[in-house]
UniProtKB/Swiss-Prot annotation:
Organism: Mus musculus
Record function comment: Component of the asymmetric unit membrane (AUM); a highly specialized biomembrane elaborated by terminally differentiated urothelial cells. May play an important role in AUM-cytoskeleton interaction in terminally differentiated urothelial cells. It also contributes to the formation of urothelial glycocalyx which may play an important role in preventing bacterial adherence.
The protein's name in its UniProt record: Uroplakin-3b
Keywords attached to this entry: Cell membrane, Glycoprotein, Membrane, Signal, Transmembrane, Transmembrane helix
Membrane topology listed for this record: Single-pass type I membrane protein
Keyword Zinc: no
Signal peptide: 1-26
Length: 275
């Protein structure tokens, strides 16, 4: 009687194991760890996005042209609870990040990840920017901005066209986003500044004052001719003699001009030298 009562559960458990075991054994584990791009890019980690290197030359032996390569994004503390979806209908979307702690986005095909040397190319940096689509909240598999600092962990999952997963990579190391500061929390008191910064500020202030004084001096010299116009120098005629002018008070100028030499009043007449 006891064997008869426990026989159906054992059969159901055995059937579940037989169904799950081939799927787990057929899932290839690729020895690749996703990571932040090594390219020297500004803003490769922001408050809502981060840039991964593209997994080129990674899936060539595990993916066919009809397969899809998905990026799984999860909070680091929820990555161990993530279970690979068995069908396309079970793929978690972005809103589930806030409820379940994970979602899938950025579906790629193998031809979008060509295996080639990009160091000599003229195109842009080969990166996958997570959280870069600011207007996709209503679309499935949205790549919307990330809601918090994290940390986040990611992995790539290869799914067959029929749905079951075929291969996956390892989880990345925790990725922390930048966190902005509240303007009210920034201390602007000069006493908090370092000694070097105070010295630099003093030097710059002194230089600014010297430049201002030099500008004012140059402006004064340049425009002084407009404020005080120079008098034209008196021109001298060749052969002229300038000396003091003696004016007599008892002889009108008109009469003094007509008197012969030696007849000036008040002077004795010159003696005549004739016999």
């Amino acid at each position: 009687m006891v064997r008869t009562r426990w026989q159906p559960p054992l059969r159901a458990l055995l059937l579940l194991v037989l169904v799950w075991l081939p799927q787990s054994l057929s899932l290839d584990l690729i020895a690749y760890v996703p990571q932040i791009t090594a390219w020297d890019l500004e803003g490769k980690i922001t408050a809502t996005t981060f840039s991964l290197e593209q997994p080129r030359c990674v899936f060539d032996e595990h993916v066919s042209t009809k397969d899809t390569i998905w990026l799984v994004v999860a909070f680091s503390n929820a990555s161990r609870d993530f279970q690979n979806p068995q069908t396309a209908a079970k793929i978690p979307t972005f809103p589930q990040l806030l409820t379940d702690g994970h979602y899938m986005t950025l579906p790629l095909s193998l031809d979008q990840l060509p295996c080639e040397d990009l160091t000599g190319g003229s195109g842009g940096a080969p990166v996958l920017r997570v959280g870069n689509d600011f207007g996709c909240y209503q679309r499935p598999y949205c790549n919307a901005p990330l809601p918090s600092q994290g940390p986040y962990s990611v992995k790539f999952l290869v799914m067959d066209a029929a749905g079951p997963p075929k291969a996956e990579t390892k989880w990345s190391n925790p990725i922390y986003l930048h966190q902005g500061k509240n303007p009210n929390s920034i201390d602007t008191w000069p006493g908090r500044r370092s000694g070097c910064m105070i010295v630099i500020t003093s030097i710059l202030s002194a230089l600014a004052g010297l430049l201002l004084l030099a500008f004012l001096a140059a402006s004064t010299t340049r425009f002084s001719s407009l404020w005080w116009p120079e008098e034209a120098p008196e021109q001298l005629r060749i052969g002229s003699f300038m000396g003091k002018r003696y004016m007599t008070h008892h002889i009108p100028p008109s009469e003094a001009a007509t008197l012969p030499v030696g007849c000036e009043p008040g002077l004795d007449p010159l003696p005549s030298l004739s016999p």
